[in-house]
Structures are given as structure tokens and as C-alpha cells.
Amino acid sequence: MKPGSWPSIGLIYLYGVATSASLSKIIPLQGDFAAQMGVTPAGFSLLLSLLTIPPALLAAAAGSIIDRIGSRTALIAAAAVGVIANLAYLLAESLAAFQFIRVFEGFIMVGAYSGAPALIMATAPPERRGRAMAFWSTYTPVGISLGLLLSAGFAGTAQWRGGYAIHLVLFAALLVAGFTLPRPPPVPLVAGAPRARLLAAWTQPGPLRLSLTFGMLVMMGFGLNIVFPAWYAAQHGASMGEASSLLALGNLVMIPGGLLAGTLLARGRRDYPLLLVLMIAAALISLPLLMPGESRVLRLLALAAWQFESGAAIAVVVAGLPRVVADARQGAAAAGLLSQVSALITFVTPLVWAPILASGQWPWFVLVVATSAALALLLFPRATSAPG
């Protein structure tokens, strides 16, 4: 496969999609875990978060290692972990087994979230790199939607693990396809202590601030994905399966938002003013989206607007990754830092949003959104010149 071509970028993109599905495929199954294993809402929030432990602890250091062993190898390994994890889910018989597998499954994120953007940055030509990274950013909505759809049709049935079987097949296909991935150009060895090189990304202000900005978007976006099915079901008398399917379809609206943002950036639009508009929009849209008593139509329109804005904001932030990386051939460390910070935020997010859902105090939802948006604007590293 030709390095830097759109087909190769598209294949790399699929690893991000399948990995994001790992995060969300469990959400429609909350009732099944309660019925089958007596899992409480707090226990389910913990189960949801366990996936993020490996990237939260290891992603930045693993990214530095991936810069040496090769991002292609990392993606093949991630797909292999996906096959093993989903097979184990099908065989698990206890909550403890699910918890252990959920942690193991997090190693997919360690490999894919560092390896995939690094391989794109290393192989895409400079004139295509920014748009390719904006396209890459849409893996989140597509993957989250895929995960919700994988399980939504099986939720509440005797075959409630059916989504895990489908996910296994998807990762098996990616494992085979991984051997057709392009090989990145060789990376020069850098002098210095090995431990210092592993932690170098944490000492670079550009990647660190960009990663923290992305973490604020995770707090908003993933938080909504956690609470919306139950919130919508309670407000409108819908089932969890129906609410999860609506959210999955709504997440797809993030794709045109991300692509539009990528197009605007490629045409010279500055990223910070664009992010400013998007964060103000997020705070305003959260009101009709989460306020009790709104009509079904208004809430779904607000959901579509929210997802469009979220997709655009993610694209703006992710497209800044090549700008803050000193050498495009060594992007895995910076991508790993972004993954590690976002994983830490992902771990905390259910612990912030789930208690608000349980209390029914919806103004706290809006406060979390507004605070996260303000922090994103403060943290985002501004470009010194207009993007080319």
C-alpha cells in the first residue's frame, strides 16, 4: 500500500474506529450487567473506566517506544489484543473476569492511539498532513457510534454479548490487514538517558497543552455519551436501546463537523478563533440538550448541533498535533501523551457525570460543560502563524 495515500490513511483510520468502539460498546449493556451480575450504577461506572487504566499509566512512555519499534508494528499488536479481549469476553462468567478483561482491553488504546496518528504523520506528505489529521480526528464519533450500535441491538436479550462477537471479527480483519500497512521512514536515534527519552513528551509545552485541551473535549463529549441514553430515556419514556441508537446516529453528525473544520484549516483559517466559537457554542447548546421538560424534537436538534460542534472542535485540536511535534517521524510520543491525558480524563469523566445523572440536578451538567470549554480555550497552544 502506497505510503501517505488516502487508501492507506483510510486503513489506519479504521484502527482508531475499532478502538473507540471498545470504549462505548458496554454503555447499552448497563441493564444487562445489573440483571446478570448485580452491578450497581457506581460499579458500572467503574467497569466503564477500567479500560483507560493502561493508556492512563503508559501511553506517553509507550509512544516513545513505538517511535523506535515502529507504528505499523504497534497497530498489528493492538489488533491482536482486540481479538484476544473480545474472545475472553465471550467466555467470561463473572464480574471479576469482565473487570480484568476490561483492563487488558485498554492495551488496544495504548497501541492504536499512539501508532495510528504517528503513522499518518510519518507517511502523509506535508501538504496532506493537516487534512489527514483532521480526518483522523473523526475516528472518535464513528467508533463511539459503532460501539453503541454493536451492543444496542443485543441489549436486554439473551444474546446480550453479541456485540463482542462482532467486534472480535472486526479486529481479526484488522489483524490480517495490518500486514499491508505502509512502513514509516526510519527514525534517527536520539542521545540521552532512556528514562528521560520515555518521559520527554511530558516536558514539551506544546504537546502537553494540546493534550490537556483534548482532555477537556473528552470531559464534555464522553460525559454526554455516558449520561444521554439514560437521561433521554427518563425524559421521554424511551428504552435504553432506542436512546443509545439515537445517540449513535447523532454521533455521526460529528463527521461533517470534523471534515468542515479540516477544510477551513487547510484554507488558512486560524485555529484558535475557530475553537473559541465552537466552545461558546458548546456552552449554549448544552442548555436545550440537557434541560428537563424540552420537547423530543428540540432535544434531538440540540443533540445534532452538539455533535457537529464537537466533531469540529476535536478536528481543530487534533489537526494541531503536527504543529507541536518537532519531527513528524517521531509523532508517537506526542500522540501517546495526548492519549494518556485523555485516558486520565476519561477515567475521571464517569465519576463526574454519573453522580449528576443520579441526582437529577441538570444545571451541574451545564456547569461542567462551561468549565471544560473555558479550560480548553486557556490551555490550547496558539499557532504563531496561519496554517499552511
Predicted regions and their residues:
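C-terminal transmembrane helical hairpin of 12-TM major facilitator-type secondary transporters
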Residues: 272-317
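Helix-to-loop junctions at the C-terminal end of transmembrane segments
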Residues: 58-70, 257-270
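Cytoplasmic helix-loop-helix junction between adjacent transmembrane helices
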Residues: 101-140
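Conserved MFS/SLC helix-loop-helix module at the cytosolic interface between two early adjacent transmembrane helices
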Residues: 57-93
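A late C-terminal transmembrane helix in Major Facilitator Superfamily
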Residues: 325-361
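Cytoplasmic membrane-interface "Motif A"-like loop-to-helix N-cap segments
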Residues: 68-78, 266-280
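Extracytoplasmic gate region of multi-pass secondary transporters
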Residues: 27, 207-248, 255
